[in-house]
Amino acid sequence: MPKRIRMTTSNATNSLIEDLRWRGLLNQTTDENGIAELLNSGPQTIYIGFDPTATSLHVGGMMQLMMLRRFQRAGHNPIALVGGATGMIGDPSGKSEERNLLSADQLQKNVDGVAAQMRHFLDFEGDNAAKLLNNFDWMKDYSYLEFLRDVGKNFPVGAMMGKESVRSRLESEAGLSYTEFSYMLLQAYDFVNLAQTHDCRIQAGGSDQWGNITAGIDLGRRMLGKQLFGITAPLLTTSDGRKMGKTESGAVWLDPERTSPYAFYQYWINVADEDVMRCLAYLTEIERAEYDELEDKTKNDPGQRTAQKRLAQWLTELVHGEAGVQSAQRATQILFGGELGDTTDSQLREIFADVPSCDVPKSALEGEGLWIVEALQTAKLCNSGGDARRALSEGGVYVNNTRVEDVQKRLTVDDLDGRSVLVLRRGKRKYALLKIQD
């Protein structure tokens, strides 16, 4: 991982702004020159909000965590705000329909899970330690009438209706509930509260948060007479505009219980060539020289997937540690024919989750065992006994990634090596999994 560097000089600010610019992370700013002047005046506080809609963040949330991380590395003070209050309502920005409202218990579980993951990205100790706050702490005792008097009176309905996040939902079939319509007021007040209590002058977020961020800036001017600033970064999307972080099996999470280090690593290994350089710029801290080198290698020899390997290694180490990287790389080697070693049942089932499989009773491996020719046909790796014999004689059959050439080979309990699965392979990449049932 890159060494942590503390910088507070004007050169550091210029470097930060320039770094954000070349990475393509400055999607919109309310006043770029004003932000640069503010950052040059000394360490500043910046915040980004995260609504706890699940017990884990998914990869899209890394864009914002990395934004806070970049500001912290430049000597500024990041606040990660968990929406214990706003999460009860749900942000309509970028959503086609209203979310189901979460119970208080589920919301707290989500808050706890998301908060723990932020520690992989931010340093919560030291001179410019990150702060983890929850907006439920200042909203829980704020009465509805007081909120309307203090905050609601500062929001012209016409201006709210003009926000893209509101207008698009009003024009949709799903419509927009009053609950969601009120979300903008709550997020705007978060900015005002943090400006009062932590002298926070900058809010950042994804491009879909522009309306909410500017609402907070307007409220700060009305309530505090203070100039606040906003920055948005692009959303993490593919070159054709689809949001990244989804696979056929669902979202790619940061929680290893929901998306294993191996699956997380593989997601980045499989990023398309036209997307990988953008991901490296958005999500890592690699320097410009290395970026340019990886870009050249991707153009000249895309088959090596050098940029994808670097992206997968960098992000997996950040989220899952060095052990997670080693585990993921070992699993990848197995997929390409490496020794199984001490790989467990569950790891093998995960590595080969997408290959054909069949159930075999354990009794078939007892006594004389299961004839390899029959096993290859059962697993549909060979069409007939003759096909299986040819594959064996040509040296193209593997059991647990060990070559088998003996046509009379019998698979027995000893071949399981304490596991409950057998990995069969024909050729380089044609796999099947035998799941042994008691």
Swiss-Prot record:
Record flagged with keyword Ligase: yes
Sequence motif 'HIGH' region, residues: 52-61
Enzyme Commission identifier(s): 6.1.1.1
One Pfam family per UniProt: tRNA-synt_1b
GO cellular component, one term: cytosol
Stored PROSITE patterns: S4
InterPro entries assigned to the protein according to its UniProt record, in alphabetical order: aa-tRNA-synth_Ic, Rossmann-like_a/b/a_fold, S4_RNA-bd_sf, SYY-like_C, Tyr-tRNA-ligase, Tyr-tRNA-ligase_bac-type, Tyr-tRNA-ligase_bac_1
Binding positions for ATP per the UniProt entry: K246
Chain positions recorded as L-tyrosine binding sites: Y47, Y183, Q187
Major localization listed first in the record, in broad terms: cytoplasm
Motif ('KMSKS' region): 243-247
SUPFAM superfamilies: Alpha-L RNA-binding motif (SSF55174), Nucleotidylyl transferase (SSF52374)
Residue span, S4 RNA-binding domain: 370-436
Gene Ontology MF: a single term: ATP binding
Superkingdom classification of source: Bacteria
Cysteine pairs bridged by disulfides in the record: none
Swiss-Prot/TrEMBL catalytic activity: tRNA(Tyr) + L-tyrosine + ATP = L-tyrosyl-tRNA(Tyr) + AMP + diphosphate + H(+)
Location within or outside the cell: Cytoplasm
One GO process term, biological-process aspect: tyrosyl-tRNA aminoacylation
Top class in the EC scheme: ligase
Family per similarity comment: Belongs to the class-I aminoacyl-tRNA synthetase family. TyrS type 1 subfamily.
Subunit-structure text: Homodimer.
Its job: Catalyzes the attachment of tyrosine to tRNA(Tyr) in a two-step reaction: tyrosine is first activated by ATP to form Tyr-AMP and then transferred to the acceptor end of tRNA(Tyr).
Protein name (record): Tyrosine--tRNA ligase
Organism listed in the record: Rhodopirellula baltica (strain DSM 10527 / NCIMB 13988 / SH1)
